Amino acid sequence: MANVTVVGAQWGDEGKGKIVDWLSNRADVVVRFQGGHNAGHTLVVDGKVYKLALLPSGVVQGKLSVIGNGVVVDPWHLLSEIDKIADQGVAITPDLLILADNACLILPLHRDLDQAREAASTQKIGTTGRGIGPAYEDKVGRRAIRVADLADPEALKPKIERLLAHHGALRRGLGLPEANAQELFDALMELAPRILSYAQPAWRVLDQAYKAGRRILFEGAQGSLLDVDHGTYPFVTSSNTAAGQASAGSGMGPSATGFVLGIVKAYTTRVGEGPFPAELFDEVGKHLSTVGREVGVNTGRARRCGWFDSVLVRQSVAINGIHGVALTKLDVLDGLKTLKICVGYKIGDKVVDYLPAGLRDQAAATPVYEEIEGWTESTAGARSFKDLNANAIKYVRRVEELIGAPVALLSTSPERDDTILMRDPFQG
């Protein structure tokens, strides 16, 4: 049986939470391998709504859930999320949740820096202000505080001093007060016992599970178009969101990551700043926003909406090595008489079939559309392909042709069971 790696193939918010929740019912282990608590997702299980940002979706199913070394972890947020889910009846014990002992921590000074930079910048990136970017900077700069450091208070003190020496200059330049080393140390020591109860060498646990033949589901956050290398830079997140990160961010070899499932909305959305060639500002855009309930789980920010962009998704299919996609929110298109799919970009007097890396070309790109007849019948709640109307089926098939990948799963509502299985990712 194959393991499965789930990645967003657009700008995030594609419905990964529901799909991972659906797949985790058939998995033994669920792993987060990058990002932080900047990308929330909503799960609806038996009518109960769970909002997660850092915990792997498998916790709701009672599956072994791992926060890998590629994730940057705000320990205060993690404990808050654990408590919130516990209040909903799901106890998150150390037997259920494993936190990689070599994962790096997000600290209050990272949030301060993130928010101050965004406020001072004339070019807004659209950061959530939760400290993810600055935490990754410290990780790459080899000055981060890691989970394992909490177990050695004496060694932690000089690490904090070194970290604050770096941040001191940054804070002064942004008009922020000096951070207090003792206060940070005391705050970390206060939560250390509880955080350390979840800490283990995650790579070792995963290696043992893999060798035992257990099904592993790798859960990506954000989307491929937000990847720090392959996304619409600089309007991106601070981590690699592509499928290749599943290996590096979990401690497992590339051969273990299995079937790559890209999650794709039947239209396109984006939060924050940055290029969006197929964005809509008309009544159709309002329809997608309203019917699709396009508001960020974490931030409450309205998402920008547009037609399905096959150019971008085809690019994501190539970069991630996607074997199949889960097409979500098909039901949001119900009632639209005419649908459009972006099949290319006009830049000056040229038409291209990919999104260039340069900001000037990205800003100049105007969409080339193909029109498809819509439908008035409802697709909401459909659980079989034969339940879909002819035009909805034509739309799905055309999407497959344009992106160069088959639709493996089709989602027709936020409910877990309103999912059509067309190809089992766990069968490879």
From Swiss-Prot:
Q: Which residues form a coiled coil?
A: none
Q: Name one GO molecular function term.
A: magnesium ion binding
Annotated residues for binding of GTP: 12-18, 40-42, 303, 329-331, 411-413
Q: Name one GO cellular component term.
A: cytoplasm
Tell me which residues bind substrate: V297, N298, T299, G300, R301, A302, R303
Primary localization: cytoplasm
Annotated residues that bind IMP are located at: D13, E14, G15, K16, N38, A39, G40, H41, T128, R142, Q222, T237, R301
Question: What reaction is this protein's catalytic activity?
Answer: IMP + L-aspartate + GTP = N(6)-(1,2-dicarboxyethyl)-AMP + GDP + phosphate + 2 H(+)
Entries under InterPro entries matching the protein = Adenylosuccin_syn_GTP-bd (IPR018220), Adenylosuccin_syn_Lys_AS (IPR033128), Adenylosuccinate_synth_dom1 (IPR042109), Adenylosuccinate_synth_dom2 (IPR042110), Adenylosuccinate_synth_dom3 (IPR042111), Adenylosuccinate_synthetase (IPR001114), P-loop_NTPase (IPR027417)
Q: What is its EC number?
A: 6.3.4.4
What cofactors are annotated for this protein? Mg(2+)
The UniProt annotation places Mg(2+) binding at D13, G40
Q: Its annotated pathway?
A: Purine metabolism; AMP biosynthesis via de novo pathway; AMP from IMP: step 1/2
Cofactor comment = Binds 1 Mg(2+) ion per subunit.
**Localisation:** Cytoplasm
Kindly state which keywords UniProt assigns to this record, in alphabetical order.
Cytoplasm, GTP-binding, Ligase, Magnesium, Metal-binding, Nucleotide-binding, Purine biosynthesis
Q: Which residues form the active site?
A: D13, H41
Pfam families listed in its UniProt record: Adenylsucc_synt
Mind telling me which HAMAP family this protein's record contains?
Answer: Adenylosucc_synth
Q: What family does the Swiss-Prot or TrEMBL record give for this protein?
A: Belongs to the adenylosuccinate synthetase family.
Q: What does this protein do?
A: Plays an important role in the de novo pathway of purine nucleotide biosynthesis. Catalyzes the first committed step in the biosynthesis of AMP from IMP.
**Can you state the subunit structure given in the record?**
Homodimer.
Annotated protein name in UniProt: Adenylosuccinate synthetase
- Source organism per entry reads Caulobacter vibrioides (strain NA1000 / CB15N) (Caulobacter crescentus)
